[in-house]
């Protein structure tokens, strides 16, 4: 598997999130997929986990997202510099820089957060699958909590 194919997979994955096509996004994830959002608190001197879900928990979370009060804008994820940092057989660890913007309904755009994705990607006969994603945010003060995967 070449790095260009892995990068294209991750770009498509981000585009599905940008379009809020969550069912299609989840289809790209393995059955044992795990998702975590974390950051380091300078004040506490330790990491903080803001979200930690498996695939079924995330699916339930997304099914109910519109039943709760949500921000009115949409998030747009911009990925940069995906690098394969580890490889074992058909499994790849990929670190990617990410900038997340929020586009309000009136057209205003603001930076939501920056950080990195550490993805584990598995090559299967049916194609690539995301087996885990850890979002490590450098930004620690968000305008609003993440109602959808960032």
Curated annotation (Swiss-Prot):
SUPFAM superfamilies, sorted: NTF2-like
Keyword Transport among record annotations: no
Gene3D superfamilies: 3.10.450.50
InterPro entries for this protein: NTF2-like_dom_sf, Rng_hydr_dOase-bsu
Coiled coil: none
Temperature dependence: Optimum temperature is 35 degrees Celsius.
Disulphide bonds in the chain: none
Keyword NAD found: yes
GO MF entry, a single one: 2-aminobenzenesulfonate 2,3-dioxygenase activity
Induction: Part of the abs operon that is induced during growth with 2-aminobenzenesulfonate (ABS) as carbon source.
Control of this protein's activity: Inhibited by o-phenanthroline.
Reaction(s) catalysed by this chain's protein: 2-aminobenzenesulfonate + NADH + O2 + 2 H(+) = 2,3-dihydroxybenzenesulfonate + NH4(+) + NAD(+)
Keywords in alphabetical order: Dioxygenase, NAD, Oxidoreductase, Plasmid
Pfam families found in the cross-reference section: Ring_hydroxyl_B
pH dependence comment: Optimum pH is 7.5.
Enzyme Commission code(s) on record: 1.14.12.14
Leading EC class: oxidoreductase
Assembly information from the UniProt record: Heterotetramer with a alpha2beta2 structure.
Role description: Beta subunit of the oxygenase component of the 2-aminobenzenesulfonate 2,3-dioxygenase system (deaminating) (ABSDOS). Can use 2-aminobenzenesulfonate (ABS), benzenesulfonate (BS), 4-toluenesulfonate (TS), 2-nitrobenzenesulfonate, 3- and 4-aminobenzenesulfonates, 4-chloro- and 4-hydroxybenzenesulfonates and pyridine-3-sulfonate as substrates. No desulfonation of ABS to aminocatechol or aminophenol detected.
Family membership noted in the UniProt record: Belongs to the bacterial ring-hydroxylating dioxygenase beta subunit family.
Protein name, UniProt field: 2-aminobenzenesulfonate 2,3-dioxygenase subunit beta
Source organism: Alcaligenes sp
Taxonomic lineage of the native organism: Bacteria, Pseudomonadati, Pseudomonadota, Betaproteobacteria, Burkholderiales
Gene label: absAb
